[in-house]
Amino acid sequence: MMKSFGSIRSIFMHADGVDWMLMALGLIGAVGDGFITPIIFFICSKLLNNVGGSSFDDETFMQTVAKNAVALVYVACASWVICFIEGYCWTRTGERQAAKMREKYLKAVLRQDVGYFDLHVTSTSDVITSVSSDSLVIQDFLSEKLPNFLMNTSAFVASYIVGFLLLWRLTIVGFPFIILLLIPGLMYGRALIRISMKIREEYNEAGSIAEQVISSVRTVYAFGSEKKMIEKFSTALQGSVKLGLRQGLAKGIAIGSNGITYAIWGFLTWYGSRMVMNHGSKGGTVSSVIVCVTFGGTSLGQSLSNLKYFSEAFVVGERIMKVINRVPGIDSDNLEGQILEKTRGEVEFNHVKFTYPSRPETPIFDDLCLRVPSGKTVALVGGSGSGKSTVISLLQRFYDPIAGEILIDGLPINKLQVKWLRSQMGLVSQEPVLFATSIKENILFGKEDASMDEVVEAAKASNAHSFISQFPNSYQTQVGERGVQLSGGQKQRIAIARAIIKSPIILLLDEATSALDSESERVVQEALDNASIGRTTIVIAHRLSTIRNADVICVVHNGRIIETGSHEELLEKLDGQYTSLVRLQQVDNKESDHISVEEGQASSLSKDLKYSPKEFIHSTSSNIVRDFPNLSPKDGKSLVPSFKRLMSMNRPEWKHALYGCLGAALFGAVQPIYSYSSGSMVSVYFLASHDQIKEKTRIYVLLFVGLALFTFLSNISQHYGFAYMGEYLTKRIRERMLGKILTFEVNWFDKDENSSGAICSRLAKDANMVRSLVGDRMSLLVQTISAVSITCAIGLVISWRFSIVMMSVQPVIVVCFYTQRVLLKSMSRNAIKGQDESSKLAAEAVSNIRTITAFSSQERIINLLKMVQEGPRKDSARQSWLAGIMLGTSQSLITCVSALNFWYGGKLIADGKMMSKEFLEIFLIFASTGRVIAEAGTMTKDLVKGSDAVASVFAVLDRNTTIEPENPDGYVPKKVKGQISFSNVDFAYPTRPDVIIFQNFSIDIEDGKSTAIVGPSGSGKSTIISLIERFYDPLKGIVKIDGRDIRSCHLRSLRQHIALVSQEPTLFAGTIRENIMYGGASNKIDESEIIEAAKAANAHDFITSLSNGYDTCCGDRGVQLSGGQKQRIAIARAVLKNPSVLLLDEATSALDSQSESVVQDALERLMVGRTSVVIAHRLSTIQKCDTIAVLENGAVVECGNHSSLLAKGPKGAYFSLVSLQRTLF
């Protein structure tokens, strides 16, 4: 009981006084709404008795009919007020409470310590789910599910109250049948939910394969793995097809079982006849009570079906309340603790022991002692996992040590106020975290109340002002999600500006330049050196050249400091750990003794090398860009989708389609036949002869029982048949779409609308929508056409006058039902848009929680959330009024139409133009058919979506790629030597046509030799590899392999002779063996070949040391393996391919020194006897290449081997690059 109370409290914990008032009024409205329909039944019993039993010549007949019809109008007016209150109050309070929940929840999440996120590996996705879908669950529960539950429950109670008031005996007899009405829905509802969850799980596996393939499309193309991936995808889809068929069968049984309602109606009809004959009950009263009993049972069933939403809301509410009430061990909101008036910045670690909360069995520090003097720079170096970055995390109190203490100016940091402590530090990380806002706003994350002058000064100090000023919008330039609109060096300089605007006493630099090229590194390093002046600075770096000027260098190994001293002091220890690390990174040139370029000279040479796309564009683009529109064909929108063409894709399933259509048509006929029979049965109660009543009742009872059985069988046929159609169509569409997508040129994937997430969403949603269109919607359409046709035919035959009037008011009925079922639900689009923006913000904040925590920017994020929600909040207030008006109007109009029908029907009877039996038959037929048409009307929205989905599917299937991988006329090379040449090539990326990469570019690469490409970022190094792989075609000029234009070759055959190893190795979810096998041409590869490839890649030893060896799962994108391990598996994959041409794109740049040494050794073995194109920032990795080409502004400015290029001296471009990276001895 207590837990239940706690769960209820968790849902309403965000309500304030206004919300409680709204909910109280909403409760009155929902209960009143539930009472309306039974009250209408009560009035209708009087009308039926008037119509069925009075003397129609009596003058009082029309007066009585008119009086009861007016009573219905009064009820209609009351229902408008009641339904308006219900619709407005619940919609309004739902939005208000959900908005407050999102704000409190995100605030609570951002308050948590970093260790919380380490222990909850899914915390980011959990937060996104809670801010988006969980808040929608609460909002939907309060706005729709709870009022529906209250309304249906009160309708159940009111129905039985009216039943007891009218005819208590019949009501008591009907009461036990409620159980029979509930069983089918409850039993099969659960089964359908279980199957739906399994289908989602099954498709998630296939969706995961598709996502990996599309996000790694360059790797898939490079290794020719398209067919393998499509086969894997197809196999994964088969499971969801089988479950889909089970779902169709279960749905048919579930809906078919509802036919028991007709059998219950038959029994109550029989018992009602006994009441008429033996107790003198009136026919109208009996009929109304039967309707009340069945309506009450149905209402209870609908009410109980809403209980699952209660449990769902309780779970969500408990989960959110748990986070909101959690007080973290390191609480940034806790304002207790000391604040020092003046801080020197002296840092000391005394005998610190530490393990990460997520890995308590792995000690990081056992007895760490470290002292950082005030105003000095201390560098921490060592291998991966030695604990360098942990020092920074502990100093910022992301975690607390298990033992020992950390002091600042002699005071333990756990005695200091957390927020103040972090304000004294500025952090710059390896991967700079920027938020999707302007440059100015990103810098202000460091200091919220900073003036524009302070922002500019910080930018100048970080060497960022000059490039920011070149942007058209200057400091208002939007950086994009995660700063994608900026280069690595630009992002890093903005991150430095953010760190120094707060004037920190302590500066923390964690691998701040490791991911940058030499030129960007020089500029950023200069900014860091400036920022460090006068500050206590702790530096972590892999590139030892960046920390050689540190006051103290500490070598960290296995969580302890094993060496301390300056650069020169540590180098004196010939066998020292620092010396060995330096040797690994040493640029081996015999002339190093003679390289003594003055710092200023090296700097000026570097500036000469600086690539300025802006200046280059103005001078070169005029003759190229004007031709661009014709060179990048736009995807034309598909023609109006052809339903016939869609059906042709379903041709193999035509037999099942026939069964489905037949079942739908037969079930469509059930409702009008049932309504007609019910109307006829009411008139039977008014017969004078008891024998006639008995005889006719027996016939109708048997008819109702027959309809129950007929409903069961026709639904099974309908739903299984259409499920079979839909499932196989979905599978076929997904296979064809993925197959077609994997023929598209890489440029297609570069567009924002074709990201891996967007494509996978289309594969999932578009195919599902088409299945829904062909399966569910088509069956409903056939069913509706059948019902409407039979209804109109029966009505016109019986009484054309009354039928025409009933037909004329049907649109009103349909619109009212449609409003209740569709429009009210679709009004939340703006709210959902607001949720999307909230989710985006939450995802960005939580995935960058360390940056948020380091800069104490929680309040800033909450303010951004309020801004994001402001628009949807205002829209919601208007929508609440609209919801109330629409709900009230639709309910009252339905009642008014009933009043009109009764009045007009009574008039026709009084005038002798229609019999009472005919009136009852037509009235009930059209009343029920209005609901059927409205039900079909709810699919109009789905038809539009389905039409869009069909267009989307055919847009993919009909699109012609600009780079055909399976050109039947293409030359198929049997053997490739590997001689490569670029002749007068012009190129710009299609997504950035105004940025010219190459103009008149030429280079020759000898076969069997290794050629290195070096140069600053943006000079076009990686573009060379993309053009060789023919990911793109040049705008002008020719790329040749072995003297043949690669555009004339069969592309997939050509790629079989080329292997690519990238900076970030792409592994797929699967075993190590499967990942290596992607390098093979077929699926049948000997184990010995796999092992030989692994040995050649220096991977065999570490693979065999794993518990499952080659059967070890790599995890999604290889997350279970380290960077060096992943890279060696990628090399083994390339070895297995036995390529003639090897392309190495920054293959070791992201590795630490030890991993780099092992991987570099494997690469050098692989390069022997092959044409190799090597791109590298670290020049130590390419000094042994036969040829080194230096690129600048999209042109080769120098070419030769390592020694010959160095011989050119300080004026040489290569010499300048080496100077930037040299380590002095």
Curated annotation (Swiss-Prot):
Keywords: ATP-binding, Glycoprotein, Membrane, Nucleotide-binding, Repeat, Transmembrane, Transmembrane helix, Transport. It holds the Pfam family ABC_tran. Residues 23-312, 657-945 form the ABC transmembrane type-1 domain. It is found in: Membrane. Residues 347-583, 980-1218 form the ABC transporter domain. GO terms for molecular function: ABC-type transporter activity; ATP binding; ATP hydrolysis activity. This is ABC transporter B family member 18. It comes from Arabidopsis thaliana (Mouse-ear cress).
